[in-house]
Regions:
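A short C-terminal boundary segment appended to hydrolase-like catalytic domains
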Residues: 58-139
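Conserved beta-sheet core of the metallophosphoesterase superfamily
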Residues: 2-67
């Protein structure tokens, strides 16, 4: 897979500069996630709250769905431990819990986009949170 310049840059920040998390923004919708070495690259986090309701032409990206990125660090080592994603839906300038089918859509879309970076996105059994972890760590 040929790496885009911004992907190489994000990986270098982790490998050479010791950055723990690269937080991508301005995509207006969630994009792929990559665990790279000891670091985490969030290629696009979308908008947590916006005023785009009613703007047409971008429905396939589901910019009405938002994610809270909950990153846990190990207290003794300071290393990244896990990433959990809490889905929300933006409705009338408020965040609400999305319907189950929208959470499943997020799971499938993020899993598909993140697999090329060696990361798996899965829905927790409670149906309210997603996990993202390196494929190599999944048993």
């Amino acid at each position: 897979m040929a790496l885009a310049p911004e992907w190489r840059f994000a990986r270098r920040l982790i490998a050479e500069a010791g950055v723990s998390v690269v937080f991508g923004h301005s995509s207006h919708h969630a994009k792929a996630i990559e665990w790279h070495g000891a670091g985490l690259i969030l290629y696009g986090c979308g908008d947590f709250l916006n005023d785009y309701e009613g703007i047409t032409g971008y429905e396939k990206y589901r910019d009405d769905l938002a994610l809270l990125y909950a990153i846990t660090f190990d207290a003794s080592s300071g290393r990244l431990d896990k990433l959990e994603l809490v889905p929300f839906q933006i409705c009338r300038f408020q965040l609400i819990h999305p319907p189950e089918e929208d959470v499943i859509w997020l799971e499938h879309t993020l899993d598909r986009e993140s697999r090329r970076f060696g990361t798996r996105v899965r829905l927790f059994s409670n149906g309210r949170r997603l996990s993202a972890e390196p494929i190599a760590n999944i048993k």
